[in-house]
UniProtKB/Swiss-Prot annotation:
Source species: Hypolepis hostilis (Fern)
Superkingdom, taxonomy of origin: Eukaryota
GO BP annotations listed: proton motive force-driven mitochondrial ATP synthesis
Name by which UniProt lists this protein: ATP synthase subunit beta, chloroplastic
Family membership: Belongs to the ATPase alpha/beta chains family.
Amino acid sequence: KPDVLPFIDNLLRFVQAGSEVSALLGRMPSAVGYQPTLGTEMGSSQERITSTKDGSITSIQAVYVPADDPTDPAPATTSAHLDATTVLSRGLAAKGIYPAVDPLDSTSTMSQPWIVGEEHYETAQGVKQTLQRYKELQDIIAILGLDELSEEDRLTVARARKIERFLSQPSFVAEVFTGSPGKYVSLPETIKGFQMILPGXLDNLPEQ
């Protein structure tokens, strides 16, 4: 009863190959030039990756997003079959934040209170709400400046920036980018850190 962990890099190549074969067969292309059978082909390949009573199979797949457009048929069709997605952000990378994972666009079907626990779930929701509000305020900040925000919004921005930095806590895989040695931080410690940032217990500390 083997347990299998396949890595797929890159799933867009599978889609492009199907598109080329479809064109050679003379089929009429669908949206953005993809093959009309894209949904069927993707479903057929993804449904083969399933656990049975004889063993489990978990796949890690790299999905290139053309023009950073998540509504493109290729990534959109793929994401419908995934249990979790980790989305990398060019904006975070430009800020020097690594790993440049966007917590707002990333998803997981496991993020449920009966799976991860009530404390973990509520903390994660609080983090996402704070980051979402910060995202909504960025246009106002760019046009009018931070000083034009209300006191409450300025606190939200400061805490959101702390959260961004906290999410970049020194990981071993990011050593080459940050120059900081990797450090393991346990899940309970991470949750506790967020629980201190969200209510403002660390407002007196700088972002860094």
